[in-house]
From Swiss-Prot:
Residues 171-181 have a biased composition (Polar residues). This is Uncharacterized protein C1919.07. One of its GO terms (cellular component) is cytosol. It is found in: Cytoplasm; Nucleus. Residues 128-206 are annotated as: Disordered.
């Protein structure tokens, strides 16, 4: 509890006296519920006092009943061998379903599908392992020269306007600087590529 200074306490008392402010009464911790005597004053109105019947049988009445002829329930003979017991499937007796027929599938019938699935799975694992994304541009390898030439033409057409110097020595693109490849250069590159591959293989085999 914070201890106030003497002058501060006097100032607060003077302010309360001037403005006629009374301290709030302390709230009781527990509400005074009173007693429950009033509940039992008129209890006779709700219960029949004239009804003197015994709610529970007395010991004497039980003795008189016991002296009489006792009736025994005859046990029925039941053959338990007639019961058809089967193990429960976990659904309960009322919710049991008939067994579904199992369809057998030959592995040869779905061999192509399994092979394609395994191939796709291996591709996905390779991409996930080496963080390789799918190529955005697909070029068919049927006719390499024509496809590359058409691809270069489309790239030239879709490229943004480039800036060339007066002498025409340099070719500068707005996005990135790259060398300008012509059709003849691409054809020469494709014709020289198999020779390079063959020489590389020959050196490797030696």
């Amino acid at each position: 509890m914070v201890v106030q200074d003497k002058w501060k306490r006097k100032a607060t008392l003077a302010y309360k006296k001037k403005h006629d402010i009374h301290d709030a009464p302390v709230k009781p911790r527990k509400k005074n519920l009173g007693n429950n005597e009033w509940r039992f004053k008129n209890a006779g109105e709700y219960f029949d006092e004239d009804n003197n019947e015994e709610e529970y049988p007395s010991l004497e009445s039980l003795k008189t009943v016991g002296n009489g002829d006792t009736i025994q329930d005859e046990e029925e003979d039941f053959e338990y061998s007639k019961l058809q017991a089967r193990p429960l499937t976990g659904l309960g007796i009322s919710n049991q379903k008939p067994k579904s027929k199992v369809r057998t599938i030959q592995r040869e019938e779905v061999a192509d599908m399994l092979e394609s699935v395994e191939h796709e799975k291996s591709i996905q694992e390779f991409r996930k392992r080496y963080n390789v994304q799918k190529p955005k541009v697909n070029i068919s390898h049927a006719e390499a020269e024509e496809d590359i030439d058409s691809f270069l033409e489309s790239m030239d057409q879709s490229a943004p306007p480039s800036i060339t110097e007066d002498k025409g020595e340099n070719y500068i693109s707005s996005n990135h600087s790259s060398m300008h490849i012509s059709r003849n250069d691409s054809r020469n590159y494709m014709s020289e590529k198999p020779n390079k591959d063959q020489s590389w293989l020959d050196e490797l085999l030696r």
